[in-house]
Structure formats: C-alpha cells, structure tokens
Amino acid sequence: MAEAQYIPRLKVQYLEKFRPELTEKFSYKNLLEVPRLDKIVLNMGVGEAVGDSKKIKSAFEDLQAIAGQKPVITKAKTSIATFKLREGMPIGVKVTLRKDRMYEFLDRLVTVALPRVRDFRGLNAKSFDGRGNYAMGLKEHIVFPEIDYDKVDQIWGMDIIVCTTAKTDDEARELLRKFNFPFTK
C-alpha cells in the first residue's frame, strides 16, 4: 500500500486557496501566470570572522539548524585594507531554500520566529525590489526555536530574501499577505 506523501501546510493552502483567490483578484488567464514562491535565501554576514575563524563555524552551525540544510561559506571578493580583509577570506554563510523546505521555513518564520522578535511592529511593506522580491532583516537569530539560547556564543543578524515569480510589487505583496506576512499598514 502506498504511503501518503507529505505536503507542507502552506503549500497546500497556496494550491487550494491562495492561487484561485489571486487568479480572481488579478484576473489571470493561465494558472502559470499566478505568482508563486520561487526561493528563500538566508544570509548571515560575519564581519568578526576576519579576526577569529571560529565565529564562521558557529554561524555555519546556527544557520544549518535554522534552515535544515548545509549552508555555503561566502568569501570576500576583494581585499579591503581598512577592514584587514583579504580576497578569499570567509566573511559569511548563506543558504538557498526551495520547494518543501522553503514552505516549512516560511511557516516557522511567520508563525513562530516573527512573534518572538522584541518590539515587533510589523514588516515594512516597501521593502520590495520592484520585481516582486522581498528583503527583510532580523537583528537576532535566536528568535528561531531551533537555536538553543544557552548554547549560543554570539547573537548574529541575518538577511532573509523571499523571491517570487510576481511581475509587480503589488502582486508579490498580495501573495505574501496570503502567507500571513505581518506588513505594517
């Protein structure tokens, strides 16, 4: 007997509820025109790694726990003498989430992590790039439940970029609103 295939909660909601609503609102003629999530990129810039390489390892492990997959260590493209930075030195970690992991991360971000942010008043609705992609930043990575607060040696900030197939910012904003992104009015 075949096992039931697991599908993330937000993906099911998108396919069954959000896509028909968006089709009706923007009067799309084809289902492939409807905006959908393409990928989510998580980036941690670790500037202190120039002096101490152990900090990259710590950020690497934390991002791996948050994303659920192995991050890539980013290296400096050029040397900058004022920062004592040489070309090729590790200065950050990033990971790209797609498919089911992307929906799972988005679910955890909206339902668990963002409500745990101190003094949170909503996300800036103007942080779109003009092509339907949304960028936001978190000052503390400890808002994610996968990170044990007692075992963290340093608190890192992180960038979160949500890439969609939307042609305009209005379409992307409406799509992310359906996913319960808490935009300010």
UniProtKB/Swiss-Prot annotation:
Gene Ontology cellular-component terms listed: ribonucleoprotein complex; ribosome
UniProt GO molecular function: rRNA binding; structural constituent of ribosome; tRNA binding
Cross-referenced InterPro entries: Ribosomal_uL5, Ribosomal_uL5_bac-type, Ribosomal_uL5_C, Ribosomal_uL5_CS, Ribosomal_uL5_dom_sf, Ribosomal_uL5_N
Annotated GO biological process: translation
PROSITE patterns: RIBOSOMAL_L5
Keywords: Ribonucleoprotein, Ribosomal protein, RNA-binding, rRNA-binding, tRNA-binding
SS bonds (residue pairs): none
UniProt subunit comment: Part of the 50S ribosomal subunit; part of the 5S rRNA/L5/L18/L25 subcomplex. Contacts the 5S rRNA and the P site tRNA. Forms a bridge to the 30S subunit in the 70S ribosome.
Function of the protein: This is one of the proteins that bind and probably mediate the attachment of the 5S RNA into the large ribosomal subunit, where it forms part of the central protuberance. In the 70S ribosome it contacts protein S13 of the 30S subunit (bridge B1b), connecting the 2 subunits; this bridge is implicated in subunit movement. Contacts the P site tRNA; the 5S rRNA and some of its associated proteins might help stabilize positioning of ribosome-bound tRNAs.
Family under the similarity heading: Belongs to the universal ribosomal protein uL5 family.
Name the UniProt record assigns to this protein: Large ribosomal subunit protein uL5
Gene name, Swiss-Prot/TrEMBL: rplE
